[in-house]
From Swiss-Prot:
PANTHER family found in the cross-reference section: THREONINE--TRNA LIGASE, CHLOROPLASTIC_MITOCHONDRIAL 2, THREONINE-TRNA LIGASE
Sorted UniProt keywords: Aminoacyl-tRNA synthetase, ATP-binding, Cytoplasm, Ligase, Metal-binding, Nucleotide-binding, Protein biosynthesis, RNA-binding, tRNA-binding, Zinc
RNA-binding keyword on record: yes
Localization: Cytoplasm
Function: Catalyzes the attachment of threonine to tRNA(Thr) in a two-step reaction: L-threonine is first activated by ATP to form Thr-AMP and then transferred to the acceptor end of tRNA(Thr). Also edits incorrectly charged L-seryl-tRNA(Thr).
Alphabetical list of CDD domains matching this protein: ThrRS_anticodon, ThrRS_core
InterPro entries: aa-tRNA-synt_IIb, aa-tRNA-synth_II, aa-tRNA-synth_II/BPL/LPL, Anticodon-bd, Anticodon-bd_dom_sf, TGS, Thr-tRNA-ligase_IIa, Thr/Ala-tRNA-synth_IIc_edit
Pfam families: HGTP_anticodon (PF03129), tRNA-synt_2b (PF00587), tRNA_SAD (PF07973)
Name of this chain's protein: Threonine--tRNA ligase
Annotated spans, Disordered: 1-22
The protein's Enzyme Commission number: 6.1.1.3
Cellular component terms per the entry's GO annotation: cytoplasm
Main location: cytoplasm
Length: 691
C-alpha cells in the first residue's frame, strides 16, 4: 500500500537550489563544497547533481568542460530516489554476505521505498529480515564508498558476471523497463563498494547509477517485508524472493512514514471489510471476485442511487448491455489486437454435433466483455441519428471482466470482476470542447459530494507502440484535452505513453485522508471508435458526419471506489452512506420498547436504524457499535423514558444527554438529508438538550 512521501520539516519536497558551476576537471563534490552547500547530516544535504541535459550525476562526476549543474537535496523526490537505490545495493550486499548462494535480480527505487529480487534456496523469514537489517547497519557505519566503473565491453561484463545469470541477461537488455536500473545509459557500468581506508573492492553490482558518495550518507532505512515475485514480472519466468524496504532523508521522516504505514494498515479496506461485515472473497468463487454482504450492499446501493440521480439531472440516458459477446465485436473495436492479455479466454459455444460426436457446424468464440464501449457504439448505430440528438450521453452500471494476474489482484482496488459507472458521450466536433469542460466539472462536483476534494489532473498521451488511428487525429485529441485540463486551474501532470490504444485521456487523481494518491475518474477523447464502427449522424446541412466519442468512468469502478472510500473514512462512512445510521441502546430491557418507538419514528423518515436487544451490558453495546462505526447511538434509561427523550452518544465518546425525542429525530434526519460527510460529534450536531 502506497503512502505519501513526507518532506522533512521546513521542506516542501521541491529543490530550491540554484544552479552552480563545476569547473572542468573538478568533481561535483568539490563544487558543492566551494558553494558552501551541505554534504551530509542534514535533510537538505546534497546527494547528486543534475547536469544541463537533465541527467543525474554522482558527486564524484568530473566534467570534461565547465558545466552548470543543479544540486539535488536528499529531501526531494530525486534525492530520496537516489538514497533508496543506494540502500537497495546495501541490502543486496547484506544478502550475499549472509546467504552467499543468493543470486541477484533487480533492485530499483519505487514510490516511498525500494526492493531487491533474489534467487535463494528458501524464502526469507522475519528473523532473516532482522539479521539483514543488522548487517546493513554495519555496512552503513563502515562508510563504504560507491565507485562507478565502466566496462570496456559487453564481453567483459558477461565474463565478470558469469555467476550472476540474471545480471548477464540484463547486459543485453533493450526493453527500456524503468525498473531495470542496471542498464540503459550510454555506457555499461558497475558500482563497486570500496573499503574507505584501503579502497579495496568489497562488493559490486551491475548498475547505471547514480548513487550517493558513501554508505554513511544513508540517514535512515527499514526493511518492511518479503514476498515471492516472478523475474521481470512474468509468471513464465523463475520465482524469486523480493525484499521491500524504505529509506528517507532523516529518522524523523522515516518515523513519520512508518506511522502512516501503520495508519494505512488500520484503514486497510480488506481488514475493515471483514470487521464491518461489508464484503468477502470466497475461495469457492475465485481470486479478485467479490461478494457484497447486506451491509456492504447498502453502501453500494447508496453510492449508485446518488450517482443515478445526478446523471439523470445532467441529461444522461440509461442503457444496459450483456456480459458476453461474440469475438467479432472485439476484433472490430481492436481489443483483441491490443488488449487480449487483459481479457479472459474465449468460450466456444453454439457448435452443432453429429451423433458420432464430430462437429457438424463449428461454434463461435464468445468473450466476457472487458469494457462496455463497443456495445454502446452498437446502441448508437442501432438507428439513424440526427445532429439534434447530440450530445447523446449514454450511461450504464456495466459489469466487466478483466484478467488480472494473481500477483496484482488486491482487495477491491484491483479485481477481476468490476462494475463501471460507464458513460459514453457522442457529440459533434463543435460541441466537443464545451462537453469536455462540463464533463470535467460534473466529475469534480460529484467526487466532492462523496467527500473527496483534493484533486490534480494527469494527461495520458499516445503509446507509440500501441495505438489505433492516425498521428494527426491523436494530436488533435491530445491538444483538446490539454486545453480543457489547463482551463480547470488544476495541476496538469503529463503521463507520456499512458493512454489506452484508442485515445488520449485525462484522469482525475484524488488524494485521500492520508495524502495517498488514487487515480479516480477518466475522461478519454476518441476519434477512432466512431471510424471503426462506422458511426454517423445527419448534420444540419444533410451530410453524414462522424461523431466524436468521449469515454468516461467517474468512480473507475464501484468496487474500487468502495475500497477507497472505506480507507478514506477508516470505515466510518458518512451518515448518509452508513449501512446502519442509528442504533438504540437501552440501559436495561425495560427501555427496549421505548427505543422501538423512537426507531419506528426514524424509519418513517427513511433512516436505517436498529435497536440492540442483545443480553450484553450497555457499556459493551456502546463499545460494539462504536467499533461498527454507527454514526448515531441513542441511549435511553428511566429519566429519558419519563422525559420522552434520548441521549446522543458519538464515536469520539462525546455525549449529549436528555435530548427531546422530536428534536433528536429532527437532528438525525436533517444531518442525513444534507449529506454531511463529516463524522457527527457532540460539537458538530446542533441539538438542544433538555438538561
Amino acid at each position: 500500500m502506497s503512502v505519501p512521501a513526507q518532506p522533512a520539516p521546513g521542506a516542501d519536497g521541491g529543490d530550491p537550489r540554484q544552479p552552480i558551476r563545476v569547473p572542468a576537471g573538478t568533481t561535483a563534490a568539490a563544487a558543492i563544497g566551494e558553494a558552501g552547500l551541505p554534504r551530509r547530516g542534514a535533510p537538505d544535504a546534497i546527494v547528486v547533481v543534475r547536469d544541463a541535459e537533465g541527467k543525474l550525476r554522482d558527486l564524484s562526476w568530473v566534467p570534461d568542460a565547465d558545466a552548470e549543474v543543479t544540486p539535488i537535496a536528499a529531501n526531494t523526490d530525486d534525492g530520496r530516489s537516489v538514497i533508496r537505490h543506494s540502500t537497495a545495493h546495501v541490502l543486496a550486499q547484506a544478502v550475499q554476505d549472509l546467504f552467499p548462494q543468493a543470486k541477484l535480480g533487480i533492485g530499483p527505487p519505487i514510490t516511498d521505498g525500494f526492493y531487491y529480487d533474489f534467487e535463494v534456496l528458501e524464502p526469507f523469514t522475519p528473523d532473516d529480515l532482522q539479521a539483514l537489517e543488522k548487517r546493513m547497519r554495519q555496512i552503513v557505519k563502515e562508510g563504504q564508498l560507491f565507485d562507478r566503473r565502466v566496462f570496456e565491453s559487453k564481453d567483459q561484463a558477461r565474463e565478470e558476471l558469469a555467476n550472476e545469470p540474471y545480471k548477464v541477461e540484463l547486459v543485453d537488455d533493450k526493453s527500456g523497463d524503468p525498473d531495470v536500473m542496471e542498464v540503459g545509459g550510454d555506457e555499461l557500468t558497475a558500482y563497486d563498494n570500496l573499503n574507505p581506508r584501503t579502497r579495496e573492492r568489497v562488493w559490486g553490482d551491475l548498475c547505471r547509477g547514480p548513487h550517493i558518495s558513501t554508505t554513511k550518507h544513508i540517514p535512515a532505512f527499514k526493511l518492511t517485508r518479503s514476498s515471492a515475485a516472478y523475474w521481470r514480472g512474468d509468471q513464465k519466468n523463475a520465482s524469486l524472493q523480493r525484499i521491500y524496504g524504505t529509506a528517507w532523508e532523516s529518522q524523523e521522516a522515516l518515523d513519520t512514514h512508518i506511522e502512516l504505514i501503520e495508519e494505512a494498515q488500520r484503514r486497510d479496506h480488506r481488514k475493515l471489510g471483514v470487521e464491518l461485515d461489508l464484503f468477502s472473497f470466497p475461495d469457492e468463487i475465485g481470486s479478485g471476485l467479490a461478494v457484497f454482504h447486506p451491509k456492504g450492499g447498502i453502501v453500494r446501493r447508496e453510492l449508485e442511487d446518488y450517482s443515478r440521480r445526478k446523471h439523470t439531472e445532467a441529461g444522461y440516458q440509461f442503457v444496459n448491455s450483456p456480459h458476453i459477446t461474440k469475438a467479432q465485436l472485439f476484433h472490430t473495436s481492436g481489443h483483441l489486437d491490443w488488449y487480449a492479455d487483459g481479457m479472459f479466454p474465449p468460450m466456444q459455444i453454439d457448435a452443432e454435433y453429429n451423433t458420432d460426436g464430430t462437429v457438424r457446424k463449428p461454434g463461435q468464440d464468445y468473450y466476457l466483455k472487458p469494457m462496455n464501449c463497443p456495445m454502446h457504439c452498437l446502441i448508437f448505430r442501432a438507428r439513424g441519428r440526427s445532429y439534434r440528438e447530440l450530445p447523446l450521453r449514454l450511461f450504464e452500471f456495466g459489469t466487466v471482466y478483466r484478467y488480472e494476474k494473481s500477483g496484482v489482484v488486491h482487495g477491491l482496488t484491483r479485481v477481476r470482476g468490476l462494475t463501471m459507472d460507464d458513460a459514453h458521450i457522442f457529440c459533434t466536433r463543435e460541441q466537443m470542447r464545451d462537453e469536455l469542460r462540463s464533463l470535467l466539472r460534473f466529475v469534480l462536483d460529484l467526487l466532492s459530494d462523496y467527500g473527496l476534494t483534493d484533486f490534480y489532473l494527469e494527461l495520458s498521451t499516445k503509446d507509440p507502440d500501441k495505438f489505433v488511428g492516425s498521428d494527426e487525429v491523436w494530436e488533435e485529441a491530445t491538444n483538446v484535452l490539454a486545453e480543457v485540463g489547463a482551463e480547470s486551474s488544476l495541476e496538469l501532470v503529463p503521463d507520456p505513453g499512458g493512454a489506452a490504444f484508442y485515445g488520449p485521456k485525462i484522469s482525475v487523481q484524488v488524494k485521500d485522508a492520508l495524502g495517498r494518491t488514487w487515480q479516480m475518474s477518466t475522461i478519454q477523447l476518441d476519434f477512432n471508435f466512431p471510424e471503426r464502427f462506422g458511426l454517423e449522424y445527419t448534420a444540419a446541412d444533410g451530410t453524414r458526419q462522424r461523431p466524436v466519442m468521449i469515454h468516461r468512468a467517474l468512480f473507475g469502478s464501484i468496487e474500487r471506489f468502495f475500497g477507497i472510500l472505506t480507507e478514506h473514512y477508516a470505515g466510518a462512512f458518512p451518515a448518509w452512506l452508513a449501512p446502519v445510521q442509528a442504533v438504540g441502546i437501552p440501559v436495561a430491557d425495560e427501555h427496549i420498547a421505548y427505543l422501538g418507538q423512537v426507531a419506528a419514528q426514524l424509519k418513517s423518515h427513511g433512516v436505517r436504524v436498529e435497536v440492540d436487544t442483545s443480553d450484553d451490558r450497555m457499556a459493551k453495546k456502546i463499545v460494539h457499535h462504536t467499533n461498527q462505526k454507527v454514526p448515531f447511538m441513542l441511549l435511553a434509561g428511566d429519566r429519558d423514558v419519563q422525559a420522552d427523550a434520548v441521549s446522543f452518544r458519538f464515536g469520539d465518546r462525546t455525549q449529549i444527554n436528555g435530548v427531546p425525542r422530536e428534536a433528536a429525530v429532527a437532528a438525525i434526519v436533517d444531518w442525513i438529508s444534507r449529506r454531511e460527510n463529516a463524522t457527527p460529534t457532540g460539537e458538530l450536531v446542533k441539538v438542544d438538550s433538555g438538561e
